[in-house]
């Protein structure tokens, strides 16, 4: 008999990769993709409609969720509000990430008590590790100043551990989607000297799908999920490579454009533990940049090269650290630079 798998956040960056991979295993699984946005879901993963079923519900509304969370064997829980939206709307982030997951837990306890849930947590739960970049699962959890997203992840992990369901937690490093190559203002929050370890979306999606076959080995445990040694670089070097691939040239922003404190990321010193169990790694950072280059049309690279100064000026205007420095904003200077004025 096929196992029933629910994937929440199925049209997200990791979700779409998980759907792509698991859709090749319909001999093993009956796959239910859950999201709240019908149009976006059809645009991103509608091509798999012959292999999966689609359900639409608001995870914060337990009544709309209940008919879907029945007779399940597995739940891959990826639905979340992530930065920068989580920073802009912290109340929404808490409602979706924490309260929504508690709804899911309650319904699993009631209607699918034997289901095994895989939860996507985040490296953000370790807080600022700029000067102590080697991270292990047993390290203290401490979200960075102003990081509402990390707080929701810490609290949700606690809720899972206190529940009566079967679970495993994967703390995701920086997950990179080569198809999402537009500038993200969040990059300015990260100190350039940050030790940065990535994982591609497809390796991450593969991890969640592979993990379904290893319930007994990983149940009740927490793991750090990242791409490994071949996916490591200082953020300044990673960004320099990304700019070259996209046609923007040098990362030549003025001093103060990037924060120097209160972010997150580092190297997962125990990241090989999960890889040794579920064998999900295939991509290196070089492979990521190759995929990124292929995803950007040549005309776009040419235009980026031609208008690079103007584009980078526009990017600078989105830098919160830069704006805080220019305006001598007390809260901003404390958050991004650890400077009290």
Label each PLM-derived region with a short phrase.
Residues 5-25:
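N-terminal Rossmann NAD(P)H-binding glycine-rich loop of SDR-like oxidoreductase domains
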Residues 48, 52-99, 128:
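NAD(P)H-binding glycine-rich loop region in Rossmannoid oxidoreductase-like domains
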Residues 60, 92-103, 147, 151-152, ...:
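Glycine-rich NAD(P)-binding loop of the Rossmann-fold in SDR/ketoreductase-type enzymes
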Residues 81, 102-148:
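Conserved Rossmann-fold NAD(P)-dependent oxidoreductase catalytic core, especially the SDR/UDP-sugar
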Residues 125-126, 147-148, 168-189, 194:
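Flexible, glycine-rich beta-alpha linker
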Residues 131, 143-168:
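Active-site Tyr-X1-5-Lys
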Residues 177-179, 186, 195-224, 228-230:
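Alpha-helical substrate-binding/gating segment
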Residues 214-277, 283-291, 299, 303-307, ...:
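Mid/C-terminal beta-alpha module of Rossmann-like enzyme folds, strongest
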């Amino acid at each position: 008999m096929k196992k029933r798998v629910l994937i929440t956040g199925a049209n997200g960056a990791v979700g779409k990769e998980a759907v792509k991979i698991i859709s090749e295993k319909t001999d093993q699984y009956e796959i239910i993709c859950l999201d709240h946005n019908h149009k976006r879901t059809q645009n991103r993963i509608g091509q798999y409609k012959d292999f999966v079923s689609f359900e639409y519900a608001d995870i914060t509304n337990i009544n709309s969720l209940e008919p879907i969370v029945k007779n399940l064997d597995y739940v891959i829980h990826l639905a979340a509000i992530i930065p920068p939206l989580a920073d802009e709307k912290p109340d929404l982030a808490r409602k979706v990430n924490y309260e929504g997951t508690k709804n899911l837990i309650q319904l699993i306890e009631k209607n699918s008590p034997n289901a095994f849930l895989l939860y996507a947590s985040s490296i953000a739960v370790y807080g600022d590790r700029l000067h102590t970049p080697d991270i292990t699962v047993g390290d203290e959890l401490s979200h960075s100043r102003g990081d509402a997203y990390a707080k929701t992840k810490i609290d949700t992990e606690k809720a899972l551990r206190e529940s009566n369901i079967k679970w495993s937690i994967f703390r995701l490093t920086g997950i990179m989607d080569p198809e999402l190559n537009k500038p993200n203002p969040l990059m300015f929050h990260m100190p350039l000297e940050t030790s940065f370890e990535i994982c591609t979306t497809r390796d991450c999606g593969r991890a969640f799908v592979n993990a379904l076959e290893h319930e007994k080995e990983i149940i009740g445990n927490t793991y750090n999920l990242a791409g490994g040694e071949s996916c490591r670089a200082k953020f300044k070097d990673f960004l320099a490579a990304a700019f070259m691939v996209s046609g923007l040239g040098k990362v030549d922003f003025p001093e103060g454009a990037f924060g120097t404190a209160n972010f997150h990321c580092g190297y997962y010193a125990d990241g090989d533990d999960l890889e040794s169990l579920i064998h999900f790694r295939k991509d290196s950072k070089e492979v990521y940049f190759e995929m990124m280059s292929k995803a950007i049309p040549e005309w776009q690279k040419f235009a980026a090269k031609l208008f690079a100064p103007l584009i980078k000026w526009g990017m600078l205007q989105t830098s919160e650290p830069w704006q805080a420095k220019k305006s001598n904003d007390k809260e901003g200077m404390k958050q991004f630079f650890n400077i009290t004025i």
